[in-house]
Design a protein with these regions (language model features):
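Conserved beta-strand segments of alpha/beta enzyme cores
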Residues: 33-35, 58, 143
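Glycine-rich phosphate/pyrophosphate-binding loop and the adjoining helix
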Residues: 1, 29, 67, 138-187
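N-terminal beta1-alpha1 ligand-phosphate binding loop
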Residues: 1-32
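Cysteine-cluster motifs in flexible loop/terminal segments that predominantly coordinate metals
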Residues: 42-72
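Short amphipathic alpha-helical segment that frequently serves as the phosphate-/nucleotide-binding helix
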Residues: 17-21, 130, 168
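Helix-loop-strand module that forms the ligand-binding subsite of alpha/beta enzymes
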Residues: 60-143, 149
């Protein structure tokens, strides 16, 4: 069993990675292999709405997205983690989400997998961003575990998120619930 977390922050080792590591640690404690993938520094291009994916069931854009998709398809659980930039998910995570068009719909590549969002905000936009990611998980057929609250944490400067006790606890519980659901589905 494996869980992969995809971090859409352009800042390495910032608050989004801190909260993601925290959730992954909770998952790993339950005996599930974990991996974190940083989108920062990868070649992630935006969807051009060319329509090729509807005809040929593949995307003609050649970049690092396909390696990430392979990891996502092989995983039992997928987490998307993003900071809030101007009231929304980062363009990195949004580009990845948009590029799954050829994997959605009738293909249902991710149906039956476990998934959910982790969101970090300085002040506002976290609920919209959380919902934005949740809708994507629903669209692709993921099962989403709950937590003690929305999977939202607060922090601006690097490390601030660790001061958000409720956010850290929520991420931990999300990790535990993710592991529980993966195990139940694999039983």
């Amino acid at each position: 069993m494996k869980a992969i977390a995809i971090v859409g922050s352009p800042r390495k080792e910032g608050n989004t990675e801190i909260i993601t590591h925290h959730a992954l640690k909770a998952i790993a404690e339950e005996g599930i292999e974990t991996e974190m993938v940083r989108l920062a520094g990868l070649d992630i291009r935006h969807c051009t709405a060319c329509g090729v994916c509807r005809q040929e069931e593949k995307c003609p854009i050649k970049d690092d997205v396909f390696g990430i998709f392979t990891k996502m398809k092989e995983a039992d659980a997928v987490i998307l983690a993003t900071p809030v930039y101007y009231g929304s998910a980062t363009s990195l995570i949004k580009a990845l989400m948009d590029r799954t068009g050829h994997l959605s719909g009738q293909r249902r590549v991710f149906a039956g997998k476990v998934g959910g969002p982790l969101v970090v905000a300085r002040r506002a936009g976290q609920n919209f961003t959380h919902a934005q990611l949740e809708f994507w998980f629903h669209l692709l057929g993921f099962y989403m575990p709950g937590s003690t609250y929305w999977n939202i944490s607060f922090g601006r400067e690097k490390g601030d998120v660790e001061k958000d006790e409720e956010g850290m606890r929520t991420a931990w519980n999300f990790g535990k619930n993710t592991a529980f659901l993966v195990k139940k589905l694999k039983a």
